[in-house]
């Protein structure tokens, strides 16, 4: 605040002293206990230069008091008892003996020497402690401004309001205007001057708006009702044309915003330095332009502050309200030369009203608002015609002429000192991040004092976030010491935490303007120079002419402003005073239908426009990505690339898996086909084997059938051979009996024949008779036959009644049947089931020979028997001598001859007994035969 008041002209020094004595109590303090702001106030009261550091100011004030004959150790100064002191140090109260602050959030530790920075730099330092730097530039420009505390916001406008009240009282203004100033102060206290919000509480607005409007209407005698004016900062872009004291809270807020941006973004501080340098140049030109202003300019300052607050609220597009009409009249520099001059300005305007109404339509942004605003302006000016005028204009011009040179010298000295300090402090500051919550500024001072002289050490945090991280801002005496501290203490441990020491890229108290604003600054310089020249010329003219020029100039400026940056349709055209930098605006409230007149200074609009420009610049700066955001974006890109790689890898794996599954399916299909082929082949082989087995079985059956057929053929052949042999044998056996005709002889009686038949059949019915026959028993037969021959003669008579023994059959005994039985013919053997077993072919001949032998033996046996019987029957009636005859011998020979045939099997033709028998018969005499 000291810096904002450092440019006050010497013309306002006496009034400032009067205001301070009237508004607050006076106390006695030692010179060494005075603050820089108190020292400068005392110097300004004595019309001395108030620039420089504290030691220079103390020396200068001490000399002045000694020249006046006072005691330098006991100085009567204003003790502002009703002023609310902030909890944190403001810009002008950075005490040298205060090492650690009470709030615990920020601290300031010096090296025992008073800070040599100006009050503006103190303001920036205070703002810097109100913010929190979250990893360099992590906070955007809009949120950084939230670090300002409400106590400080309320303190500065309140103190400035007291100063305005004192100045009004020193000029003897009416009581109504003093009350209005008090109300204005209360309204300002209710304004939230945070550089990010600039919001006004609605209840405070309504409470302060109504009384102020009524008082202004009473003073001015108007029928117009004051309403809040909402204007774009772009419409209000005009250079400074007012006293240095009129910079007030608007300048402070703008600088606070610059400081917030520089603390949040250290790399942007150089641009802000250029901007501040440009403002200083404009301020100097404004001092020249206000050289002819009145001594009561402090009243205009009060009005401009309240208007500037309203403008700042409008810039943020919040529903901020301010006493527009009343402040417009109060802020009119023409009417502030004397208490009654304020209302007389409106009475001087009717002459120029017609010119304003003619020129004003060309500056309107659109046809419809232009017509309505013309009507409103005409109505407002006509309603203000009855206000009386006051003749107090020359005093302000004289006072301004006397103090113009001192203001120029003061501004030059101030600018040079700032430039020198800006150059000397370049590269000395650095940030310390990663601090513990228990780290204090004294700890930082003790730590960095090992490597050089520590000019200042501060611990900052976000006051609105209780748990925010702490950062340190340290200023060394030289850039080399700062570099040494960075090299030695970067990445070291302090209070158990790793700290990072990084050099500040630009100084927070810089004065440079960004390159993109150089063109605007040059234009503002040119326009300010033109207005300064116009002011000097117009001060020599008449007041009415001055009023006309004011109206003309304001109309032209309104045209330029509307052409460059047109506002909304509800904005009214503005008329600017080139001589005093004022602007009169008439608007129509569409909701109430009441015209509103507002007079504003161009300086406040210039500050508002600069604030708007700063906001636009800050919005542009918000687009600048901080290191953390870059790191975060890089991490996000890395994570995205990792996810992309993971997705590609998963897709590739899925493709490989699908390909593997497809190949596996193909392999399985091929294997299934191969198995099916093998199965078909095995099936075919099995069927082939079955077919071959069937064929083999068929061939076997054929072979078996063939063997059976061959066997049957062999059997048939054998049977045929047997039949043939049998047929060949039968005629030879039957021939003797057929030749013999004795059957028909009467020798054989029928009865006897039958009996013999019976005996024969019964005797030979036994099948095993042949087998029981023993050839060794043949010896019995001769005896038997002899016996029979012996008894035959005696028994001849009884022969008819006798029967032959069973073993001697009759002639029929030797029949066919008997032969069959004795010979075991083939028919009999087959019928009895006693056939010979099948013999192999190789045994057939031997069997046939054996069979022939058996048959030959049987034949001989039969032949012998028959011959013996025949001899018995034939020689039964002869004598015994007959037995010894040839017949007996033949019989014996026949019997012996039976076993004398060759083994090869002689036929019956070779049997000798037959011939013997025939020879026997042939040797018989005919007589004996007949007998």
Swiss-Prot record:
It is found in: Nucleus. This is Scaffold attachment factor B1. Residues 550-816 are annotated as: Interaction with POLR2A. Residues 224-233, 368-380, 412-423, 500-573, 581-592, 603-663, 759-820 have a biased composition (Basic and acidic residues). One of its GO terms (biological process) is positive regulation of transcription by RNA polymerase II. PROSITE patterns: RRM (PS50102), SAP (PS50800). A motif (Nuclear localization signal) lies at residues 621-638. Binds to scaffold/matrix attachment region (S/MAR) DNA and forms a molecular assembly point to allow the formation of a 'transcriptosomal' complex (consisting of SR proteins and RNA polymerase II) coupling transcription and RNA processing. Functions as an estrogen receptor corepressor and can also bind to the HSP27 promoter and decrease its transcription. Thereby acts as a negative regulator of cell proliferation. When associated with RBMX, binds to and stimulates transcription from the SREBF1 promoter. It comes from the Eukaryota. SUPFAM superfamilies: RNA-binding domain, RBD, SAP domain. Its main location: nucleus. The modification Phosphoserine is found at residues 24, 55, 79, 194, 196, 208, 405-406, 437, 602, 604, 623, 626. The modification N-acetylalanine is found at residue 2. Residues 1-35, 64-121, 205-304, 316-430, 500-663, 691-720, 759-843, 872-931 are annotated as: Disordered. GO terms for molecular function: chromatin binding; RNA binding; RNA polymerase II cis-regulatory region sequence-specific DNA binding; sequence-specific DNA binding. There is a cross-link at residues 230, 316 (Glycyl lysine isopeptide (Lys-Gly) (interchain with G-Cter in SUMO)). Residues 67-77, 98-118, 267-287 have a biased composition (Acidic residues). The modification Asymmetric dimethylarginine is found at residues 892, 898, 908, 914. The modification N6-acetyllysine is found at residue 629. Residues 341-356 have a biased composition (Polar residues). Phosphorylated by CDC-like kinase 2 (CLK2). Monomer and homodimer. Interacts with KHDRBS3. Interacts with CLK2. Interacts with POLR2A, ASF/SRSF1, SRp30c/SRFS9 and TRA2B/SFRS10. Interacts with SRPK1 and inhibits its activity. Interacts with RBMX. Interacts with FUS. Interacts with ZBED4.
């Amino acid at each position: 605040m000291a810096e904002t008041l450092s440019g006050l002209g010497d013309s306002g020094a006496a009034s400032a002293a009067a205001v301070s004595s009237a508004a607050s109590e006076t106390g006695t303090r030692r010179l060494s206990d005075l603050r820089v702001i108190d020292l400068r106030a005392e110097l300004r009261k004595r019309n001395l230069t108030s620039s420089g550091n504290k030691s220079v100011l103390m020396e200068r004030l001490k000399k002045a008091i000694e020249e006046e004959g006072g005691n330098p150790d006991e100085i009567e100064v204003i003790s502002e008892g009703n002023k609310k002191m902030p909890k944190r140090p403001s810009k002008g109260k950075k005490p040298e003996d205060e090492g650690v602050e009470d709030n615990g959030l920020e601290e300031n530790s010096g090296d025992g020497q008073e800070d040599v920075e100006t009050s503006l730099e103190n303001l920036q330092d205070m703002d810097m402690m109100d913010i929190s730097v979250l990893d360099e530039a992590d906070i955007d420009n809009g949120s950084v401004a939230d670090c300002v505390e409400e106590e400080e916001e309320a303190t500065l406008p309140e103190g400035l309001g007291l100063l305005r009240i004192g100045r009004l009282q020193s000029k003897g203004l009416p009581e109504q205007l003093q009350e209005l100033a008090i109300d204005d102060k209360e309204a300002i206290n209710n304004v939230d001057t945070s550089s990010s919000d600039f919001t006004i509480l609605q209840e405070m607005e309504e409470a302060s708006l109504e009384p102020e409007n009524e008082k202004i209407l009473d003073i001015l005698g108007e029928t117009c009702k004051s309403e809040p004016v909402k204007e774009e900062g772009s419409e209000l872009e005009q250079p400074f044309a007012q006293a240095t004291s009129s910079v007030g809270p608007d300048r402070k807020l703008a600088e606070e915003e610059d400081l917030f941006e520089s603390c949040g973004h250290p790399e942007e501080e150089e641009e802000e330095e250029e901007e501040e340098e440009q403002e200083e140049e404009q301020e100097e030109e404004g001092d020249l332009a206000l050289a002819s202003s009145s001594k009561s300019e402090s009243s205009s300052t009060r009005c401009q502050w309240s208007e500037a607050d309203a403008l700042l609220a409008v810039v943020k597009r919040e529903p901020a309200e301010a006493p527009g009409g009343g402040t417009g009249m109060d802020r009119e520099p023409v009417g502030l030369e004397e208490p009654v001059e304020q209302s007389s300005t409106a009475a001087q305007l009717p002459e120029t009203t017609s010119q304003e109404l003619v020129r004003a339509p060309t500056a309107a942004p659109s046809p419809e608002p232009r017509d309505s605003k013309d009507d409103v302006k005409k109505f407002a000016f006509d309603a203000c015609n009855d206000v009386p005028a006051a003749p107090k204009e020359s005093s302000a011009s004289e006072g301004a002429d006397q103090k113009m040179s001192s203001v120029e010298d003061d501004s030059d000295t101030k600018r040079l000192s700032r430039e020198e300090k800006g150059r000397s402090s370049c590269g000395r500051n650095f940030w310390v991040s990663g601090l513990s919550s228990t780290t204090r500024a004294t700890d930082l001072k003790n730590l960095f004092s090992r490597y050089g002289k520590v000019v200042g050490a501060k611990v900052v945090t976000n006051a609105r976030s209780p748990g925010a991280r702490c950062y340190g801002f340290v200023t060394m005496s030289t850039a080399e010491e700062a570099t040494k501290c960075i090299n030695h203490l970067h990445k070291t441990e302090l209070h158990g935490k790793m700290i990072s020491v990084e050099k500040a890229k630009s100084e927070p108290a810089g004065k440079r303007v960004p390159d993109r604003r150089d063109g605007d600054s040059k234009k503002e310089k040119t326009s300010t120079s033109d207005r300064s020249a116009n002011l000097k010329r117009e001060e020599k003219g008449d007041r009415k002419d001055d009023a006309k020029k004011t109206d003309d100039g304001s109309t032209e400026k309104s045209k330029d402003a509307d052409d460059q940056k047109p506002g909304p349709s509800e904005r009214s055209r503005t008329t600017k005073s080139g001589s005093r930098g004022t602007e009169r605006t008439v608007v129509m409230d569409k909701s109430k239908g009441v015209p509103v007149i507002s007079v504003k200074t161009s300086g406040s609009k210039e500050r508002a426009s600069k604030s708007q420009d700063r906001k636009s610049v800050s919005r542009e700066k918000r687009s600048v990505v901080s290191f953390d955001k870059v790191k975060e974006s890089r991490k996000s890109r890395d994570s995205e690339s990792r996810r992309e790689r993971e997705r590609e890898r998963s897709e590739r794996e899925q493709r490989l898996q699908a390909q593997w599954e497809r190949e596996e399916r193909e392999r399985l299909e091929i294997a299934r086909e191969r198995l099916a082929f093998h199965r078909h082949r095995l099936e075919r082989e099995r069927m082939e084997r079955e077919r071959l087995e069937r064929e083999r079985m068929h061939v076997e059956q054929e072979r078996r059938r063939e063997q059976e057929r061959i066997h049957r053929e062999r059997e048939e052949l054998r049977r045929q051979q047997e039949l043939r042999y049998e047929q060949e044998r039968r005629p030879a056996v039957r021939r003797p009996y057929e030749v013999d005709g004795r059957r028909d002889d009467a020798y054989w009686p029928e009865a006897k024949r039958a009996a013999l038949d019976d005996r024969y059949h019964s005797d030979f019915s036994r099948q095993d008779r042949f087998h029981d026959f023993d050839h060794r028993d043949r010896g019995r037969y001769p005896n038997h036959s002899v016996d029979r021959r012996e008894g035959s003669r005696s028994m001849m008579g009884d022969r008819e009644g006798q029967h032959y023994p069973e073993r001697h059959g009759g002639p029929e005994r030797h029949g066919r049947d008997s032969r069959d039985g004795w010979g075991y013919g083939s028919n009999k053997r087959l019928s009895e089931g006693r056939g010979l077993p099948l013999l192999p072919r190789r045994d057939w001949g031997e069997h046939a020979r054996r069979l022939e032998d058996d048959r030959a033996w049987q034949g001989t046996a039969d032949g012998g028997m028959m011959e013996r019987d025949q001899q018995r029957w034939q020689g039964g009636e002869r004598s015994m001598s007959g037995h010894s005859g040839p017949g007996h011998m033949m019989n014996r020979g026949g019997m012996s001859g039976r076993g004398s045939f060759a083994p090869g099997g002689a036929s019956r033709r070779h049997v000798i007994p037959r011939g013997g028998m025939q020879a026997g018969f042939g040797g018989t005499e005919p007589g004996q035969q007949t007998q």
